[in-house]
Amino acid sequence: MVMMAVLMADTGMTVLLAQGIANASGPVFPLVSPFIGLLGAFMSGSNTNSNVMFGLLQVETARALEIGPVTIASIQSIGASVGSTMAPTKVLVAAAVVGLAGQEDQIFRKVTIAVLALVALTGIEAMILVTLFENWTR
C-alpha cells in the first residue's frame, strides 16, 4: 500500500484525483472527508494504512478548496479510527475472542450502524468547524 501511495503521489495521480473530488464535492467536502477515511480503514483494517492510502488525497483536496490541510487530515484520521472498528478482520477476531464465532454478520450489522452514525456526526462537526472557524482552519 505504501508503494501504491508513493507511485500515485510521484506521478501526479493524487493531485488529479484531488482536483476531481474538489470539483465534485465543493464546499461539502468536510462532510465527505471522514467517510473517505472510513473506506480506507474498512479496506485495510488499519487507521495507519488508511492515512497512507488517502492522507495525501485529503490534503491535496483541502488545498484545492482552500481549507486547512491539517484540519482535513485530522478529520480523515478520525474517520479512519472509527471506521477501523468495522473492518472485517477486526470483527472476525473480536467474535472469536468472545466466543461468538459464526455470528459475525450480526455483530457487523450492529457495529456498522454505530460506526456510520459516528462518522456522519464527525462530518457534520467538520462542516461546522470549517464554516464557523474558516480563518483558523487554514
Please annotate each region the language model reported.
Residues M1-M4, E60, A64, A117-A120:
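Small-residue-rich segments of transmembrane alpha-helices in multi-pass membrane proteins
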Residues M1-M8, A24-L57:
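Hydrophobic alpha-helical transmembrane segments of multi-pass integral membrane proteins
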Residues A5-A18, M43-S46, E125-T137:
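Transmembrane helix-loop junctions in multi-pass membrane proteins
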Residues G12-P27, L56-L57, L65:
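Membrane-interface interhelical connector segments
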Residues G26-P27, L57, T61, T112-L118:
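Small-residue-enriched core segments of transmembrane alpha-helices in multipass membrane transport
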Residues V28-F42, L65-T89:
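Alpha-helical transmembrane segments of multi-pass membrane proteins
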Residues M43-I75, E104:
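Hydrophobic transmembrane alpha-helices that form the pore/transport pathway of multi-pass ion
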Residues S81-R138:
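Juxtamembrane and boundary regions of transmembrane helices in multi-pass small-molecule transporters
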